[in-house]
Amino acid sequence: MNEEKHWNRIAPTYNAEIFDVFQSDKRKVLTKYFKKHTNIKHEAIDFGCGNGKAFSYLAPRFKKVLGVDISEKLLRQAKALLHKNIILKQGDLTQSLRLPKVDFIFCCNVAILPEVQTNIAIIKNIQKTLKVGGHALVVIPSLESMIYSAWRLIDWYKKENVKPEKIDTSEYAGLSGKKIDILQGLVSIDGVTTKHYTQQEIEVVFTRCELTVLKIEKIEYNWNSEFTKPPKWMKEPYPWDWLVECVRL
C-alpha cells in the first residue's frame, strides 16, 4: 500500500475515521508522561504527527517541536493550528531522513504497518534522532488486548446462551487471518492490516534497536472502543494500547 496516497485520501475525514487516543485515554496516562518530560529548554519531534492532535500537549512543554508526517494534506491541517514554536516537515519515517537530534520524541500508532521490518525501521529512526540521554514515548497497539477483547466477546455471547462456535465469524474478523500473520501480531482493523505487539516483544525489539525501555504502561479505553453497544456490566479490565517510555543511552 502506498502510505502517502492512503493518508492523503483519508485526510478530509481523518478526525472521524482515526481513533483519538488523547480523548479516549481513560486515566490520562499520556498527560502524566508529557508532564514528566516537560522541559521548555528541550526540543521535540512528533513522529507521524498527522493533523496535529498532539500539538496542544507538546507545544507548551518544549522550546521547539518538529512535526513530521508522510501526508501533505494532513500537514496542511496541522499548519492551520498556528502554534508558534512548531514547524512541519513532510517525510517518510520508514526511510533515512535528515532530522535534527532532539531531547524528546513522541510517536503515536505509527510503527503499526503490516511489513514488520518497516516498523523496525521507524523505531531505529527514533533511536538515531534522539540525543544521548533523550527520551521517547511510543504508543502501539496491544496484541494481548486484541485477544482479551475477543475473549470478552465470547463471554458476552455465553451470557446470552450462544455457544462460541455459533458466533458469526464477522464478529472477530480481525483474528481470522493466516496463523503466521496472527502470530506476528498482524491483525485486521476495518479491513486494514495493523501490527500489534506483545509486552515481551516490545522489550526485545526496542533493545535490538538500541533503546532502553524504562516503562511499559497501559493506555486504557472504554469498551465502546471495541464494541458498538457494550453491555453495562462489562467493566475493567479495559482494552488498551501500550505506552512505551524509552531512552537512548
Residue ranges and their predicted role:
Residues 1-39, 41-48, 57, 137-168:
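Conserved class I S-adenosyl-L-methionine
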Residues 51-95:
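Class I SAM-dependent methyltransferase SAM/SAH-binding core
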Residues 106:
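A conserved beta-strand element that flanks and buttresses the S-adenosyl-L-methionine
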Residues 120-132:
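A short glycine-rich, Lys/Arg-flanked "PGG" loop and its adjoining helix->strand segment in the class I
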Residues 229-249:
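Core SAM-dependent methyltransferase catalytic element
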